[in-house]
């Protein structure tokens, strides 16, 4: 896991606007939020991470980490029971920040659904986990 963290996964979102998916009702393709790092400030910093928490990119990062764990940590191959818990909280954070019927919630939900479908090489999270661990 240290290898994953050394990659500084949040850095890939620095300077990247949150642009709604084309299929997001009423706002398809529009920029919903942006974060501009201050000049001469490192990114990611605490301010940026607070911004990231209120975007679907937070869930995307969690699922990238889960994918890393599934591929690299040999879960289910030892004598002890392994447990992988995935908590996708961005939907909750975004809902509280922007309201349950906001375009931000719609876009976050669509992205979370898409990202869950693509988790694992087989294309479906449940199939990937079932194939790997039974």
Specify the residue positions occupied by each region the protein language model found.
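Short secondary-structure boundary/capping segments
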Residues: 98-106
């Amino acid at each position: 896991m240290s290898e994953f963290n050394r990659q500084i996964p949040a850095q890939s979102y620095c300077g990247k606007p949150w642009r709604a998916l084309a299929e997001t009702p009423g706002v398809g393709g529009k920029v919903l939020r942006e974060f501009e790092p201050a000049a001469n400030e490192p990114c990611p910093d605490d301010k940026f991470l607070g911004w990231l928490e209120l975007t679907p990119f937070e869930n995307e990062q969690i699922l990238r980490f889960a994918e890393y764990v599934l591929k690299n940590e040999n879960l289910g191959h030892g004598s002890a029971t392994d447990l992988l818990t995935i908590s996708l909280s961005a939907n909750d954070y975004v809902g509280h920040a922007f309201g349950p019927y906001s375009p931000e919630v719609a876009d976050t939900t669509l992205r979370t659904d898409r990202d869950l479908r693509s988790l694992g090489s087989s294309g479906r999270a449940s199939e990937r986990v079932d194939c790997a661990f039974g």
